[in-house]
Structure formats: structure tokens, C-alpha cells
Amino acid sequence: MHAFAVDGLPEIDAGDDLAALVAERADLTDGDVVCVASTVVSKAEGRTAALAEFTPGPRAEEIAARLADVTGEQKDPRFAQAVIEEATEVIMDAPFLLTETTCGHVGVNAGIDRSNTGGAELLLLPKRPAESAARIQAGLAADVGVVVTDTSGRPFRHGQRGVALGWAGLPAARDWRGETDRDGHELAVTVEAVVDELAATANLVSGEGDDGTPVVVVREFEFGDHDGSEQLFRAVDGDFVRQALRGWTFDGA
């Protein structure tokens, strides 16, 4: 397996055909997985916004005041309102906003970006990244998989890594349960988050900052003769970390 960046992509504007732009610059073959950064998907889909578009309600005012108390920095309640509107749940409101987005992804600030925004104040995540991935896949001639990626922090460890927000043309996970390890023992719990691993691979190749490349092709990845699964995001009743966070309050300030 190897991965390479798709070079020469222009700055993406609303209405741009990402599939066509990729196809013009990459000689894709059947079985490739095309990993596309959510930032360019959002730009192509016109998911930019100005803070003035968000009128803060009482909850946003409360969150902004609380964050200002905790961090010692002034917080814009309009940004808090944008996060509330883009989230399905605010899991934590201090010392930062941890949210669930409409696609099921849990991250900070509903994934709203204030860098690489193409001149806008805010760049919102794609509304339905799985549908975004399917549209890109449909526009490519080769039989490929597509993963819409983002960078995200993680609990218990420093640093960010690439994760999948939406995907098409391949299962989300590879299920090893029922197979055996090298000692002949049956595997009982191993379900491998394939699309996240592909997203992390792409993130290593694409890089960050002004040298970043938003599209990476992973070639000769083989899913193998395994069961697949579309389950990537935990249901709340089995997500014990989220349940614990719901009952937790930050008491640092």
C-alpha cells in the first residue's frame, strides 16, 4: 500500500466540482481510496459563514461568559451561537465546547474552522459528509472509495490525527471477530476502524498549514476477505465516556 498527494489543486470556491478537479490531476485506478479534506468539501458546498449571521441567544451568552471566566479571554457569543446551531448536543461547555455534530462526529466547536477559510470568518463542516463522499465518488470514472477527512483531538493523548467524517465505496470498519490470531485463539472484540486509519494515513501525507494538500490517494489498500460494518460512531447507551461527561462539571474557575 502507498499514498500520494494530488498536487496542483486550485483554491476551492463554492460550486467547484471536486471530482472533476481531482480526475484532471490524478490517474485513478479501480480500488484506490480518495481521501478529501473536509475543508475543501465545505468550500465547494458553500459552507462558509460570517459571525454576523448568528444572533446569540441566552445559552450562547451564558457559554461565552463562562468560557471567558475560565480562560481569562473574551469570547464572542456569536461564535458560541454558531456552535450551538451546528451541534446536535453540547456535551461540555467548559473549558472548551465539546459537541456532537449532525453526522455523529464528536469534536471541539462543532468542527467550525477559523483557519483555511478562504477569506470567510467561519468554515462549517459539510452538512452530510457521507452524501458529499458519495457525490465525489459518483463523479470519478474509476471504481474508488472516497473518505471525507478532518483533523481531531483525542482523549488521553496529546496531538491531533486524521479521522473520517463520511465515506462511500467501502465499509467503515473491518470486523475480525470470529477469526483467529497467530496462536489459534478466536478474536472476540476486534473491529478495526478502517476509514479512520485511511484518514490518518492521508493526514500524514497531506500535512498541515500552508504546505497542506487537501486530497490524497491511497493505492493498493486491500480490505481483505472480512466482514464489514458501517458502525463508526458509538450509540449513546454504549458510550460510557459521554455518559460520564454529561454528569461532569469543570471546576477550574
Curated annotation (Swiss-Prot):
<keyword id="KW-0479">Metal-binding</keyword>
<comment type="pathway">
    <text>Cofactor biosynthesis; coenzyme F420 biosynthesis.</text>
</comment>
<feature type="binding site">
    <location>
        <position position="208"/>
    </location>
    <ligand>
        <name>a divalent metal cation 2</name>
    </ligand>
</feature>
<comment type="subunit">
    <text>Homodimer.</text>
</comment>
<keyword id="KW-0630">Potassium</keyword>
<dbReference type="GO" id="GO:0052645">
    <property type="term" value="P:F420-0 metabolic process"/>
</dbReference>
<feature type="binding site">
    <location>
        <position position="43"/>
    </location>
    <ligand>
        <name>GTP</name>
    </ligand>
</feature>
<feature type="binding site">
    <location>
        <position position="150"/>
    </location>
    <ligand>
        <name>a divalent metal cation 1</name>
    </ligand>
</feature>
<dbReference type="GO" id="GO:0052618">
    <property type="term" value="F:coenzyme F420-0:L-glutamate ligase activity"/>
</dbReference>
<protein>
    <recommendedName>
        <fullName>Coenzyme F420:L-glutamate ligase</fullName>
        <ecNumber>6.3.2.31</ecNumber>
        <ecNumber>6.3.2.34</ecNumber>
    </recommendedName>
</protein>
<dbReference type="InterPro" id="IPR023659">
    <property type="entry name" value="F420_ligase_CofE_arc"/>
</dbReference>
<keyword id="KW-0547">Nucleotide-binding</keyword>
<feature type="binding site">
    <location>
        <begin position="206"/>
        <end position="213"/>
    </location>
    <ligand>
        <name>GTP</name>
    </ligand>
</feature>
<keyword id="KW-0342">GTP-binding</keyword>
<feature type="binding site">
    <location>
        <position position="151"/>
    </location>
    <ligand>
        <name>a divalent metal cation 2</name>
    </ligand>
</feature>
<comment type="similarity">
    <text>Belongs to the CofE family.</text>
</comment>
<keyword id="KW-0436">Ligase</keyword>
<keyword id="KW-0464">Manganese</keyword>
<dbReference type="InterPro" id="IPR002847">
    <property type="entry name" value="F420-0_gamma-glut_ligase-dom"/>
</dbReference>
<dbReference type="GO" id="GO:0052619">
    <property type="term" value="F:coenzyme F420-1:gamma-L-glutamate ligase activity"/>
</dbReference>
<dbReference type="GO" id="GO:0005525">
    <property type="term" value="F:GTP binding"/>
</dbReference>
<feature type="binding site">
    <location>
        <position position="116"/>
    </location>
    <ligand>
        <name>GTP</name>
    </ligand>
</feature>
<feature type="binding site">
    <location>
        <begin position="38"/>
        <end position="39"/>
    </location>
    <ligand>
        <name>GTP</name>
    </ligand>
</feature>
<feature type="binding site">
    <location>
        <begin position="9"/>
        <end position="12"/>
    </location>
    <ligand>
        <name>GTP</name>
    </ligand>
</feature>
<dbReference type="GO" id="GO:0046872">
    <property type="term" value="F:metal ion binding"/>
</dbReference>
<feature type="binding site">
    <location>
        <position position="113"/>
    </location>
    <ligand>
        <name>a divalent metal cation 1</name>
    </ligand>
</feature>
<keyword id="KW-0460">Magnesium</keyword>
<dbReference type="Pfam" id="PF01996">
    <property type="entry name" value="F420_ligase"/>
</dbReference>
<dbReference type="InterPro" id="IPR008225">
    <property type="entry name" value="F420-0_g-glutamyl_ligase"/>
</dbReference>
<comment type="function">
    <text>Catalyzes the GTP-dependent successive addition of two or more gamma-linked L-glutamates to the L-lactyl phosphodiester of 7,8-didemethyl-8-hydroxy-5-deazariboflavin (F420-0) to form coenzyme F420-0-glutamyl-glutamate (F420-2) or polyglutamated F420 derivatives.</text>
</comment>
